[in-house]
Amino acid sequence: PTSNASAEFIKATWELQCNATPVKYQNSLFQDLNPSHNHLSKVKLNQELWGDFIFNIDSNAFSLSQELSQGSQQSTLLNFLYFGVEHILTGYDHLLFILGLLVLFARWRLFLSITGFTIGHSLSLFLGSVGIVIAKMNIVEALIGFSIFFLGYEYFYKNFFLSRRQYFRFWQLMPLGILFLLWVLGIIGFLLFCGMTVFVLSYSKIILDDQEMVKPLLITAFFGLIHGLGFASNLSGAGFTDNLILGVLGFNIGVEVGQLLFASIAMLALALITRLFGVQALILSKHGISSLLLSFGIYWFILRML
């Protein structure tokens, strides 16, 4: 085999000659070390693309016959759709961000925020997967954590500190203080510190205006661009040049299906809490969720920058 290694993935090519059919191919490499590990594989039969496959702990084998009955395009779309659903439902940082949108927005603003997030991550997922946009994944993953932190920050900003003037200025300056401390400690660079400081100051102004319809869409679209680059890290460099568009499309549809499934369950749970225990229980639940957003968001940001 020939291989090419990088920080994010290992790419290897095998050529096998088998006289007997059907052929069963099994791949369980690294799964004893990391049960969540996935292999993205492009299979060719007699120099013709047979399909793109994903091997994981639950499905690590498939049978290959001379008849291309499944069709490479159909297998690519379905396999990557399943991969997208699995990725979003096991991506706890992405799920926590969606939960933050449910806590922060309601009715049409919730619809706009989820729409913006979908547009943003769909665009950057495609651009990152085809190699048009190349980003440092540790910074992308860290910024995903920071986006989660900011949903919790906005919730308490609007629902607690805005009506308590004695703490209001402290809450405004708190994220700037965190960024300054991380820069002094050498955890983040000067350019990242300056860029995020400008963002924090701008964001603090934007979130005070609840009357603007387009702002939830634009803000979550911006966050979606960051999350989409995180999604793209699962596909970039995999070498799916033949069915690249179908692979990205299937993965993105899978992410949307998983996202809607999780959002529906979470909304049902919040509605059930309200019905059984009253509005006060719902408010306490939102406080608790927003506290998780703050703590896990800043934890992931610092951890991924180290």
Indicate where each model-derived feature is located.
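Hydrophobic alpha-helical transmembrane segments in multi-pass membrane proteins
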Residues: 86-226, 232, 236-237, 243-247, ...
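N-terminal soluble domains immediately following signal/targeting peptides that reside
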Residues: 1-86
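Acidic-enriched, low-complexity/disordered segments with a strong bias for Aspartate over Glutamate
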Residues: 32, 52, 58, 93, ...
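Active-site-proximal inter-transmembrane loops
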Residues: 75-82, 240-250
